[in-house]
């Protein structure tokens, strides 16, 4: 089988696998026409919420990310924009994906599965629920391997220099991981102290329901307000978390957590608003 045919077969496999695996775990998913529109429609400034998301970490240089939904397809490269204005706020939007790399003029499939987007009014994050990867060390064929990771976290960043000077704000939203988007995030920021802390609850695995230890708000290299701290389970450090603050008035947070468990490191997407 030539590589071109192999890539087409991989997309078909991704569609079948994702159709079988989607919708579990009580996930609030976007299944409306907006999925196809996100791939085909031009940007419309009348759309509500964050209108576009630059795919930076989701697609590396020299790679291609092919997304499909409801009969529509589109291929993205590093730095391309996804039309998130067509997606529903505060829900997981699900696309089938294949990730490919070009070698000697040929596209080779690296992995396939489900590409997820969680959008708020001022921020969004992407995640990959991989179902198959290329067995590069042995057969070179696609083999089943389920894994979950976070891609991009982006939006309308809050400048560190424009944070509220005082007061406290509590953010409530979602925490989601592999086959489980039923988690809840609660995070409180003390703007006077420039510090935040919170917790993740209601995920299926008890060891993923963790405390997000108090951590300072700091400026990153672009002067965006960000928070990085430790994850605690039964008061023991079990990983780390990072959050960006988004919106002109610090209305939202979005980020991720990495939790060490008996089955390895688990990745969790985080998003919440005041």
Curated annotation (Swiss-Prot):
A lipid is attached at residue 20 (S-diacylglycerol cysteine). Disruption phenotype: Bacteria are more sensitive to complement-mediated killing. GO terms for cellular component: bacterial extracellular vesicle; cell outer membrane. It is found in: Cell outer membrane; Secreted; Extracellular vesicle, Bacterial extracellular vesicle. Its main location: membrane. A lipid is attached at residue 20 (N-palmitoyl cysteine). Residues 120-183 are annotated as: Domain B. Changing residue 249 to R: Increased vaccine efficacy (G1 variant). Induction: The amount of protein increases as cells approach stationary phase (at protein level). InterPro entries: FHBP (IPR049378), FHBP-like_C (IPR014902), FHBP_N (IPR049377), OMP/PagP_b-brl (IPR011250). It is a lipid-anchor. The record marks 223 as: Important for antibody recognition. It holds the Pfam family FHBP_C. PROSITE patterns: PROKAR_LIPOPROTEIN. Residues 1-19 form the signal peptide. Residues 27-119 are annotated as: Domain A. Part of an outer membrane vesicle vaccine; antisera against this protein induce efficient complement-mediated killing of the homologous strain. Three antigenic variant groups were detected upon sequencing of group B strains; antibodies against a single variant group provide reduced protection against the other 2 groups. Thus inclusion of an example of each in a vaccine may provide adequate protection against all strains. Recombinant protein lipidation increases its immunogenicity. This is the variant used in the 5CVMB vaccine. Keywords: Cell outer membrane, Lipoprotein, Membrane, Palmitate, Secreted, Signal, Virulence. Residues 184-274 are annotated as: Domain C. Protein is lipidated in N.meningitidis upon growth in radioactive palmitic acid, probably on Cys-20. Transmembrane segments: none annotated. Divided into 3 domains by antibody recognition; domain A (27-119), domain B (120-183) and domain C (184-274). Domain A contains linear epitopes that are common to the three GNA 1870 (fHbp) variants, antibodies against it recognize N.meningitidis cells. Domain B contains linear epitopes common to variant 1 proteins but antibodies against it do not give a robust signal against N.meningitidis cells. Domain C does not have linear epitopes but antibodies against it recognize N.meningitidis cells. Bactericidal antibodies are directed against conformational epitopes located in the BC domain. A bacterial surface lipoprotein that binds host (human) complement factor H (fH, gene CFH), binding contributes to the avoidance of complement-mediated lysis by N.meningitidis. Binding of fH to the bacteria surface is independent of bacterial sialic acid moieties. fH binding affinity is high enough that it may sequester plasma fH, depleting its circulating levels and de-regulating complement in the host. This protein induces high levels of bactericidal antibodies in mice. Binds to host factor H (fH from human). Both fHbp beta-barrels contact Sushi domains 6 and 7 in fH (also called complement control protein domains, CCP). This interaction probably mimics the normal (carbohydrate-dependent) mode of fH recruitement, regulating fH activity. Sucrose octasulphate inhibits the fHbp-fH interaction. One of the major antigens of group B N.meningitidis and a powerful protective antigen. It is highly variable, over 300 protein variants have been seen (see Factor H binding protein sequence typing website). The protein in strain MC58 is called V1. This is Factor H binding protein.
């Amino acid at each position: 089988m030539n590589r071109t045919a192999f890539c087409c077969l991989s997309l078909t496999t991704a569609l079948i696998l994702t159709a079988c695996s989607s919708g579990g775990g009580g996930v609030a998913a976007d299944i409306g026409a907006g999925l196809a529109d996100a791939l085909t429609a031009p940007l419309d400034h009348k759309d509500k919420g964050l209108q576009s998301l630059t795919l930076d970490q989701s697609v590396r240089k020299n790679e291609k990310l092919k997304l499909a939904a409801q009969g529509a397809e589109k291929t993205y490269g590093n730095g391309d924009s996804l039309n998130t204005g067509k997606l529903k706020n505060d829900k997981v939007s699900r696309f089938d994906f294949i990730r490919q790399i070009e070698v000697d003029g040929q596209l080779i499939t690296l992995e396939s599965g489900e590409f997820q987007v969680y959008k708020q009014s001022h921020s969004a994050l992407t995640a990959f629920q991989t179902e198959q990867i290329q067995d590069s060390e042995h057969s070179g064929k696609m083999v089943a391997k389920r894994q979950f990771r976070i891609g991009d976290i982006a939006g309308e960043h809050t400048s560190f220099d424009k944070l509220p000077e005082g007061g406290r704000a509590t953010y409530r939203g979602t925490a989601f991981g592999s086959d489980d988007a039923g988690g809840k995030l609660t995070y409180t920021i003390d703007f006077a102290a420039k510090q935040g802390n919170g917790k993740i609850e209601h995920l299926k695995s008890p060891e993923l329901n963790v405390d997000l230890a108090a951590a300072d708000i700091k400026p990153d290299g672009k002067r965006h307000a960000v928070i990085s701290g430790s994850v605690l389970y039964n008061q023991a450090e079990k990983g780390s978390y990072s959050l960006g603050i988004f919106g002109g008035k610090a209305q939202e947070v979005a980020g991720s957590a990495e939790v060490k468990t008996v089955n390895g490191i688990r990745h969790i997407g985080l998003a919440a608003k005041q």
